[in-house]
């Protein structure tokens, strides 16, 4: 069995990993912790035309990569504490699309993700979670 855990570094994401780990530690599953952030091009567009090829964009891109690695490493640590071995995957692009791409190419049995990652969202499910639920070809466990 292969499980894809998704994290954006939020407390809710970590709680989803923790809650699921306690349920699946007897399955001896292979686990991957995926963290997705904006692509280099998107960072440039967000910062504006004058920053697209600047040092600011490169520095921002490095900071994003560092944070994504930290988020995924935290997820792996939670899983290891529950006796589950996991590997880290980092992706850059539109978050839901990258989760769906990894789910399909990695031959996972199901996806685990938090209901929403951003605090203050008034909806029951966040936009990324809604998109993954609508388009995933495998079960999605939402915590």
Region spans (language model):
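Conserved acidic residues
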Residues: 1, 109, 137
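Small/aliphatic-rich secondary-structure junction motif
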Residues: 2-55, 84
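Conserved beta-strand positions in the Rossmann-like core of class I SAM-dependent methyltransferases
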Residues: 32, 87, 141
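A short acidic, glycine-rich active-site loop
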Residues: 53-70
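Structural beta-alpha unit
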Residues: 77-111
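Glycine-rich, Arg-bearing micro-motifs that act as flexible, cationic patches
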Residues: 110-134
